[in-house]
Amino acid sequence: MSQAQIDEIFALLDSAAKVLIDQGVLPADWQNNSQITRSKSPEHGDYASNIALTAAKAAKSNPRALAEQLTAALPANDSIAKLEIAGPGFINIFLNTDAKFAVLDAIFAKNQKYGLTDEFANKKIQVEFVSANPTSSLHVGHGRGAAFGMSVANLLEAVGYEVTREYYVNDAGRQMDILATSTYLRYLQLNGEQIHFPVGGYQGDYVTDIAQTIKTQQNDAYVHSYADISANAPEDEVSEVNDAGEKEVVSGDKNAHIDVIIANSKQALGDNYAVFLNAALSEILGDIKDDLNEFGVRFERWFSEKSIADEIEPVLAELDSKGHLYEKDGNIWFRSTDFGDEKDRVVRRANGLTTYFASDIAYHKNKFERGFDTVINVWGADHHGYIARVRAALTALGIDEKRLEVILVQFVALWRGEEKIQMSSRSGKFVTLRELREEVGNDAARFYYVARKPEVHIDFDLELAKSQSKDNAVYYIQYAHARVCSVLEKLAAKGFDVDDAQGSAQQHLLTADAESELIKLLAAYPATLKRAATGYDPHVLTNYLKDLASLFHAWYNDNRILPVSIIADETPSQEELDMMQARLRLSKAVRQVLANGLSLLGLSAPTSM
């Protein structure tokens, strides 16, 4: 629905309510919390208001009787044709013809900007999303976070926010050491060393490929005996499959084992350890950037964890000065339970090293120091337990934790026939985002990733995503856009042009119920965008586009846009031309809104299919 129309109707009814306040029917302190909604069927008008129902208690009156008084007190307005009272006291509003078609004028006046507002201009918001460890290629689960985060950012920009999209690069810490050491062990193997590759290492072929590049460039310059690298390492994890078909640890400790391998590698290589870390980071992060760029996902900033290394100690000192840290068992703990967390959290281990959580405290403090009014973290559902400790840290630092929004994105289950693909980046057995995109295309992936609420699991149906039928929502939406383009091509091929002035002059001919419903749905687009943006919920827009495409296809199938006479190369009557131009105007409006919505979701609007 048109926000301008809603605001106008709300103001008119509010004026009527003020008349009743002056008459003593409503108390002076009554607040108008009513809603204007789009009517579901033409016989109930264009819009409906529940003002009489919400005000009845304050007026100590029957809602229908109060509705009669409100409609009687309503100021005269050229946009409203009539009012009807329905049911328990709803007020149905019927618009005049000119008011109905105002939305078409708005669409053609604004084109790609139709639906956009500056309501939240001068508000700065950061959306941090994906932020996958640069230890392997992105998998299909990361893809959902990418599509969701980008769509949310686009929607926020559509309503005026100044948005910064950010990827937090975890380029420091233990996972990077595991990656660097995994690469070094493969390098030793390529140079003829007999090694045991750790259970806790990164097993994918990409690690060997990186090691091969280093070997090609440096030959055996960094070789040390595996005996030295594995010296004093405790037994690695040994497991077997039990009777239930589950892997069961029999002996050993994979974490303790690889930690010694890492320490020995660092000692043996010295400064050259960075050769393996940097080579792996550069290769994998470059692949991630390329993958996301191909997916249409961009970031204003790639924020390195290393860049805040000097900010960790000051933030811990600040927490300590406020009495929020204490020592226990050699570790330094943050009193997270004082701020609602389920348990206190270690920020410095007994060995003197700070934890990942300590880095995250510094990172979040850094975010708010950059002046964002709101910070949105798009995290995987497995980070649920992490939210409370981050909010606790912000509160302890004197930052309003309500300025942090955390959106958890549930997992994606990918099905290929009867087989559910399991994913594990350490084992190297996972379906990458790139593989998914190559199979179903960017558009299908982007759409189905956001077609459900983020807290809902997705079972990604590959066959449906590739099908060309109305069951495939993204195909059906794009086909509606292409259908309009096809009509315009046929029109031009017959030697006729779209006459915008004539279409505007004849739009009063669009009196069919389906045409009225299409126009009302087009008018609802701006409000839909606002609801999707402020609710951080792109699936509101996907549902809207499905509804618009479905309604258009039904109307198109029942109504001929190009007259039979034109198709048959005969001279059309003036009546046929008038109706054609009116329907072309409506079709073009639908095409524009479909294109606008698809663009915000990062999808293409094809001209042919």
From Swiss-Prot:
Pfam families: Arg_tRNA_synt_N, DALR_1, tRNA-synt_1d
Main location: cytoplasm
Transferase is among the record's keywords: no
Motif ('HIGH' region): 132-142
BP GO annotations: arginyl-tRNA aminoacylation
GO CC annotations on file: cytoplasm
Similarity comment: family membership: Belongs to the class-I aminoacyl-tRNA synthetase family.
UniProt-recorded name of the protein: Arginine--tRNA ligase
Organism in which the protein naturally occurs: Psychrobacter sp. (strain PRwf-1)
Biological classification of the source: Bacteria, Pseudomonadati, Pseudomonadota, Gammaproteobacteria, Moraxellales
Name of the gene encoding the protein in the UniProt record: argS
